[in-house]
């Protein structure tokens, strides 16, 4: 149970496409720059 909880805390975020800031999952705009285009944080590496 603790592992799933930790994974959710790490990966259940949204990333701003303009400034790459981490935002809460329920965010509709970036907390730093106000940009509205957010993507979910990648769960797998891109390598």
From Swiss-Prot:
A GO CC term assigned to this protein in UniProt: ribonucleoprotein complex
| Entry-linked Gene3D superfamilies | 4.10.1060.50
Query: Which GO BP terms sit in this record?
Result: translation
| Keywords from the UniProt entry | Ribonucleoprotein, Ribosomal protein
Pfam family, any one: Ribosomal_L40e
- Which residue stretches, if any, does this entry annotate as coiled coil? none
Give GO MF terms, alphabetically: structural constituent of ribosome
Family according to the record? Belongs to the eukaryotic ribosomal protein eL40 family.
For this protein, the record's NCBIfam families field holds:
PRK04136.1 (NF003161)
**Protein name, entry field:** Large ribosomal subunit protein eL40
